[in-house]
Amino acid sequence: MKQPFLLLVAVAGALAGCGPVRTTANILDAEVQIQAARTAGAEEKATYEWTAANLYIEKAREEVGYSDYQAGVSFAEKASQCANAARLKATNKDPEAAEKARRECHPETAEQKSGSPNP
């Protein structure tokens, strides 16, 4: 009877430790994407996406500070998407990929642009 309980406690303890690791990895990935966007000149050529990426990464760090790792992961992923969109827009090598990345960064603005009503 005690063995299943101990196994359950061990698994729960192991899973509890995954949140900070995954969040840290996502934040580091977003920071790399932001640096790549900076190198491409996104601060001047893709101001909207650049600013969004930086605000999302700040919010990710804030949520991690409150131990809300799920929100931290979500905001870090959003920061990566926006930084990627900023980099693609700044380099202007593939306009279709840049537009797709921009829509991933801000899907609500893509809906407005296409004429869909706002919910």
Locate predicted features:
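Long, charged/polar, soluble alpha-helical segments
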Residues: 18-119
